[in-house]
Curated annotation (Swiss-Prot):
MF terms in GO: ATP binding; proline-tRNA ligase activity
Keyword Protein biosynthesis: yes
Lineage: Bacteria, Bacillati, Actinomycetota, Actinomycetes, Micrococcales
Pfam family, one: tRNA-synt_2b
EC number of this enzyme: 6.1.1.15
GO biological process, alphabetically ordered: prolyl-tRNA aminoacylation
Transmembrane segments: none
The protein, known as: Proline--tRNA ligase
Domain-level remarks: Consists of three domains: the N-terminal catalytic domain, the editing domain and the C-terminal anticodon-binding domain.
Function comment: Catalyzes the attachment of proline to tRNA(Pro) in a two-step reaction: proline is first activated by ATP to form Pro-AMP and then transferred to the acceptor end of tRNA(Pro). As ProRS can inadvertently accommodate and process non-cognate amino acids such as alanine and cysteine, to avoid such errors it has two additional distinct editing activities against alanine. One activity is designated as 'pretransfer' editing and involves the tRNA(Pro)-independent hydrolysis of activated Ala-AMP.
Superkingdom of origin organism: Bacteria
Gene: proS
InterPro entries tied to this protein: aa-tRNA-synt_IIb, aa-tRNA-synth_II, aa-tRNA-synth_II/BPL/LPL, Anticodon-bd, Anticodon-bd_dom_sf, Pro-tRNA-ligase_IIa, Pro-tRNA-synth_IIa_bac-type, Pro-tRNA-Synthase_IIa_type1
Keyword Magnesium: no
Native species: Tropheryma whipplei (strain Twist) (Whipple's bacillus)
Sequence similarity: Belongs to the class-II aminoacyl-tRNA synthetase family. ProS type 1 subfamily.
Length: 613
């Protein structure tokens, strides 16, 4: 098929928009693959749609290989099902809510567990109807607080979500593993690096959850790799508790004047220059800081949360939470939010301190009224710390946990650092972007929505469910980010919007294009009346892997072939070039399928491991 640029919906730009946060995102905008229409909202242009459809078709093929059946649900749903499952409240402000003219509650679905469950409830009545795995590729909606990085964190995004339905837990595990294998094949064919990590189920619910993370410093997910190869999202990583220490002979805690000290570095410098610690250097890790947050009470289903820490907070009506963490650490807000779900927390601002005179900046410590204290696991019984004394310019030295101060619970929410000790040895901390997520939901939605079938003995039995998501638009953005240089995009052949990009420089040789008509390739011909420099610049920006230059420098059937992957140029007869491209396309498809079948390297299984490809 021949597509001429002169008749195509197409425009390129020479400069990145001011809001561009990454090189690949900038090229997608400049080359006209997508257009931003609002904060976190994008239009897909013809070039972008062609690449997106190729990604979707690879996903469809691999879903078909594990007998998953495609359907398509609406994005707009009545809130009734979501209220039944509890997610209407559990999702908080992350969902778009709206009302119809009769004041009925509706939402733009972030995922479709409830809809799939209701559909299967109406279709499946017997054990003979199971197992089934059903999926869709559809746009989803989440009210992101801070959309960023283009398609990587947007309010509207394309996603493949699949759901499995099984009669028992064994069947669920089999369906889960089938989807996991399919995901490996998909990402291998797309040549996307990934790590499989143990993850938090969050508002989705269920017992077992794993993420496919693409390692990149652009990522907003932190994951931990242990010495034995196990990998965990930081949200679920468990810090080993510090050992209990005998403090029977420990000296009494002392108050120390610390005028002007408002930070941990100030406190460390003051202590080391005070002369109190002869022969010892005080470090940040010797100090225990209290980070104060304001608690925002979200609606809690039935008023009886399963989270025991949250239950304590609700029962006693605390307004504030104080995290006691070593001075060389900070609170990881994502870990804290997971640990305290469905409550939300916000750092204490100036107004909090103005309304609470007992909250002394720089000297906050344990013991304040109205504060629920959560201590880091390293704050073990008998451990000694330098703490704030809750008085201006005063700290306490040698305060013993369990003797001089107490706390309401131990909560593992502090930041994790490379080199931290674990039961598997030192850990390595990395960043990544989630590209896939697997959940064993169990009976959560089946019980909530009444999905049951008759078993062999004629008894009603709740159906076990799994949920499996892939971010399609996010994959598109990551592939662009990975495949570019300083001049533009460099799409792999299997995903490129066209097989060939012809730069026509000589109208006298335009008849050569006719021989491309029936070759079976998808060809973009730049026939515009613009300078050669503009055409070459746009060809590099768009990133089709093979650029064919038809100009006066070659004669007869010869054309200049420009390989965008390595920027090498050769002169070949047109027919030979066409055959080479066709063979490359065929070989790329075959190789992708074969590579997709290789599941080697997974050390995870049910026990959880790290697969890095």
């Amino acid at each position: 098929m021949i597509t001429k640029v002169s008749g195509f919906l197409f425009r390129t730009f020479r400069e990145d928009p001011a809001t561009t946060e990454s090189r690949g995102y900038g090229f997608l905008l400049r080359a006209g693959y997508i257009r931003q229409t609002g904060s976190g909202i994008f239009s897909w242009m013809p070039l972008g749609l062609k690449v997106r459809h190729k990604i979707e078709n690879i996903i469809r093929y691999e879903m078909g290989q594990v007998n998953a059946i495609e359907v398509l649900f609406p994005a707009l749903f009545s809130a009734d099902l979501f209220k039944q499952s509890g997610r209407w409240s559990e999702y908080g402000d992350d969902i778009f809510r709206l009302k119809d003219r009769r004041q009925g509650d509706y939402l733009l679905a972030p995922t479709h567990e409830e809809a799939f469950t209701q559909m299967m409830k109406e279709i499946c009545t017997s054990y003979r109807d199971l197992p089934r795995t059903v999926y869709q590729i559809q746009d989803k909606y989440r009210d992101e607080l801070r959309p960023r990085a283009g398609l990587l964190r947007s309010r509207e995004f394309s996603m493949k979500d699949a759901y499995s339905f099984d009669l028992d837990e064994k069947g669920l595990r089999q369906s889960y593993e089938a989807q996991k294998r399919a995901y490996k094949k998909i990402f291998d064919r797309l040549k996307i690096d990934y790590v499989i990590v143990k993850a938090n189920a969050g508002a989705m619910g269920g017992s077992v959850s794993e993420e496919f993370l693409h390692p990149t410093e652009m990522g907003d997910d932190t994951f931990v790799v242990t010495a034995d190869g196990s990998a965990f999202n930081a949200e679920v990583y468990v810090t080993p508790p510090g050992p209990a220490i005998d403090y029977s002979n420990a000296p009494e805690a002392e108050d120390c004047e610390t005028p002007g000290v408002i930070s941990i570095p100030d406190l460390v410098n003051h202590m080391n220059s005070s002369g109190r610690f002869i022969g010892r250097v005080i470090e940040s890790s010797d100090c225990l800081k209290c980070l104060l947050f304001r608690i925002e009470y979200a609606e809690v289903q039935n008023g009886n949360p399963s989270n025991l820490v949250v239950k304590k907070i609700l029962e006693r009506g605390f307004e504030y939470i104080g995290f006691l963490v070593p001075g060389d650490r900070n609170v990881d807000l994502k870990r804290a939010q997971v640990a305290l779900s469905p409550l939300t927390i916000e750092p204490a601002d100036n107004r909090v301190f103005e309304c609470n005179p007992s909250f002394v900046r720089g000297s906050i410590g344990p013991g304040l009224s109205g504060v629920f204290y959560c201590a880091d696991p390293r704050v073990s019984l008998g451990s000694s710390w330098i703490i704030g004394a809750n008085r201006p310019g005063v700290h306490r030295i040698g305060a013993i946990a369990g003797r001089d101060f107490s706390f309401d619970c131990t909560l593992d929410v502090s930041s994790i650092k490379t080199g931290d000790k674990s039961e598997w040895g030192p850990v390595t901390v990395k960043r990544g972007i989630e590209i896939g997520h697997l959940f064993q939901l169990g009976l959560k939605y089946s019980n909530a929505l009444g999905l049951k079938v008759l078993d062999k003995d004629g008894y009603n039995k709740a159906v076990f469910m799994g949920s499996y998501g892939i971010g399609v638009s996010r994959l598109f953005a990551l592939i662009a980010e990975k495949n570019c240089d300083e001049r533009g995009l460099k799409w792999p052949a299997v995903l490129a919007p066209f097989d060939l990009h012809v730069v026509l420089l000589s109208s006298a040789r335009a008849e050569l294009i006719d021989s491309l008509t029936d070759c079976g390739l998808d060809v973009l011909v730049d026939d515009r009346r613009v300078s050669p420099g503009v055409k070459f610049t746009d060809a590099q920006l768009i990133g089709v892997p093979k650029i064919i230059v038809i100009g006066d420098k070659t004669r007869g059937e010869d054309v200049e072939v420009w390989d965008r992957a390595n920027d090498q140029r050769t002169v070949l007869p047109l027919k030979e070039m066409i055959q080479g491209v066709i063979q490359g396309v065929i070989q790329g498809v075959i190789q992708g399928v074969i590579q997709g079948g290789d599941t080697g390297g997974d050390t995870g299984g049910d026990t959880g491991g790290c697969t890095e490809r």
